[in-house]
């Protein structure tokens, strides 16, 4: 056994040489950053609701997430730590004693656990090893009004378009391997979640989304009501991408046809259905930024960097342009990113960086306007 200190808690887990779903008890040290962000997000959400909240950790493993929520998030009155692995259940109980907390510990399949506790939780956290897709229907059915659904997906090769058929099977959506494929993956996951919620007359609004390391993470507020659900799914649509000139655009609705690129005339490829609405909530993220300094986080600097990047992206159109990719298509060397952004702003366009790729920019300018700015910065 080894001792792990994370946030304000200490746990003991079996020694491991490689993170794997086959490990006796699943604990991934690389996900500390994920859990740090989650602690901050839950604190802000708790204050948004006011009063005490109940939290479900559906794939608890060592219990680290549920225990941290109890210890570090003010207002968490109860936390449920569930895992189907009997060794994990014993580990959760032992780690709870170490930290002087008492989560409700259960050993059930995640879907059964959620359905047997219908409407009980203010926060449902789904952080499996792999895809969350098989559990999303149960999560959608169980989510109470005005609750938070926090979802992790580590099957990024499917969501990003390396393997198209698995994404079609799991998420009923076609991915596309572009420079912004990680954003497309986030939007596929958000759209899939929203459609699952809509079946139960519940609406989704994305508070925060990020693609980090080997996973994608969403924080979605759930509201009940058929009218709200109808409004929510108006954010479902498709991304269209031209691989010849890198033009991209999005359309709302469920039946787009491949069409001619308005910039170069080539046929565009399609990704979706997916979420084309906002994937960052500026107010929620702003409050998270203010909360970071109140928490004991080993990755506080990285958390702040991520949140500030996500805040910059709020309200910007779907997709982004990798300036190095654009310049490569043009056969030119890339100028400093700041110069490109300044040029676009001077031309009257909105522009921001993206947390997903350091050489990417978000803007409401089209590829033609970007090429004009680049031409001014890099004369022949």
Curated annotation (Swiss-Prot):
Lineage: Archaea, Methanobacteriati, Methanobacteriota, Methanomada group, Methanobacteria
Reaction(s) catalysed by this chain's protein: guanosine(26) in tRNA + 2 S-adenosyl-L-methionine = N(2)-dimethylguanosine(26) in tRNA + 2 S-adenosyl-L-homocysteine + 2 H(+)
Regions annotated as coiled coil: none
GO terms, molecular function: tRNA (guanine(26)-N2)-dimethyltransferase activity; tRNA binding
Binding site for Zn(2+): 242, 245, 261, 264
Organism: Methanothermobacter thermautotrophicus (strain ATCC 29096 / DSM 1053 / JCM 10044 / NBRC 100330 / Delta H) (Methanobacterium thermoautotrophicum)
Family: Belongs to the class I-like SAM-binding methyltransferase superfamily. Trm1 family.
Domain of life, source organism: Archaea
HAMAP family (UniProt xref): tRNA_dimethyltr_TRM1
Keyword line: Metal-binding, Methyltransferase, RNA-binding, S-adenosyl-L-methionine, Transferase, tRNA processing, tRNA-binding, Zinc
NCBIfam families listed in its UniProt record: TRM1 (TIGR00308)
Chain residues that bind S-adenosyl-L-methionine: 35, 65, 83, 109-110
Stated name of the protein: tRNA (guanine(26)-N(2))-dimethyltransferase
PANTHER family: N 2 ,N 2 -DIMETHYLGUANOSINE TRNA METHYLTRANSFERASE, TRNA (GUANINE(26)-N(2))-DIMETHYLTRANSFERASE
EC number, as in UniProt: 2.1.1.216
Signal peptide limits: none
General function of this protein: Dimethylates a single guanine residue at position 26 of a number of tRNAs using S-adenosyl-L-methionine as donor of the methyl groups.
Disulfide pattern: none
Start and end residues of each Trm1 methyltransferase domain: 2-374
Any single biological process term in GO: tRNA N2-guanine methylation
């Amino acid at each position: 056994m080894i001792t792990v200190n994370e946030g304000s808690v200490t746990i003991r887990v079996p020694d491991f040489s490689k993170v794997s779903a086959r490990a006796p008890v699943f604990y991934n040290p690389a996900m500390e950053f994920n859990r740090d962000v989650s602690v901050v997000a839950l604190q802000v959400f708790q204050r948004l609701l006011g009063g005490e909240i109940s939290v479900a950790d559906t794939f608890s493993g060592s219990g680290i997430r549920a225990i941290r929520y109890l210890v570090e998030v003010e207002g968490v009155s109860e936390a449920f730590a569930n895992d189907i692995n009997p060794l994990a259940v014993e580990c959760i109980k032992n780690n709870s004693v170490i930290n002087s907390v008492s989560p409700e510990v259960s050993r059930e399949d995640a879907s059964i656990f959620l359905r047997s506790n219908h409407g009980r939780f203010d926060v449902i956290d789904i952080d499996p090893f792999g895809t969350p897709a098989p559990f999303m229907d149960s999560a959608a059915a169980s989510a109470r009004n005005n609750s938070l659904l926090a979802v992790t997906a580590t099957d990024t090769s499917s969501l990003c378009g390396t393997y198209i058929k698995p994404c079609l099977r799991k998420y009923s959506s076609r991915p596309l391997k572009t420079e912004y494929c990680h954003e497309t993956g986030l939007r596929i996951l958000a759209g899939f979640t929203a459609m699952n919620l809509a079946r139960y007359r519940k609406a989704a609004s994305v508070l925060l989304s990020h693609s980090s390391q080997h996973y994608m993470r969403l924080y979605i507020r759930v509201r009940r009501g058929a009218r709200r659900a109808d409004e929510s799914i108006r954010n479902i649509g498709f991304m269209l991408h031209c691989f010849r000139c890198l033009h991209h655009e999005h359309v709302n609705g469920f039946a787009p046809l491949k069409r001619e690129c308005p910039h170069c005339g080539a046929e565009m490829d399609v990704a979706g259905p997916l979420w084309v609405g906002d994937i960052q909530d500026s107010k929620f993220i702003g409050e998270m930024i203010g909360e970071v300094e109140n928490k004991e986080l080993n990755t506080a600097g990285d958390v702040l960097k991520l949140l500030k990047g996500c805040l910059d992206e709020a309200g910007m159109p779907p997709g982004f342009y990798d300036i190095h990719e654009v310049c490569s298509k043009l056969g030119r060397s890339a100028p400093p990113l700041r110069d490109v952004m300044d040029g676009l702003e001077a031309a009257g366009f909105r522009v921001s960086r993206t947390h997903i790729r350091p050489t990417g920019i978000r803007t409401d300018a089209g590829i033609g306007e970007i090429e004009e700015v680049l031409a001014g910065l890099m004369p022949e």
